[in-house]
Amino acid sequence: MVQRIRERVYSIDAKLYLCDEEDFTFLLNELESILDEEAASFGTMPEGLQESGRGLESRNAQAYLQKAVKALREVTDKKNRRKMQELMDEVHANLRAV
């Protein structure tokens, strides 16, 4: 599950280098979509699995994404590409740590 999150976030990050300011909102919505899907997927896990190491990884990854979405929303409103890239780098570091 966490690997899938990583792959999808890296995909968004690659698009970030190519986008203009109007695309920031689209990419942020895509990131929020990943978060929603992973939260729904976690909710369908059997209760025992939610408490396992895999469930903990999923919760940690979701927490990092929630934090990132909030920060990216603020940055996107200001259209600050450099800060957005710094935040995406932080997201990647946190996901690698999970």
PLM feature segments, named:
Residues 1-98:
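Feature detects long, helix-prone N-terminal segments enriched in hydrophobes
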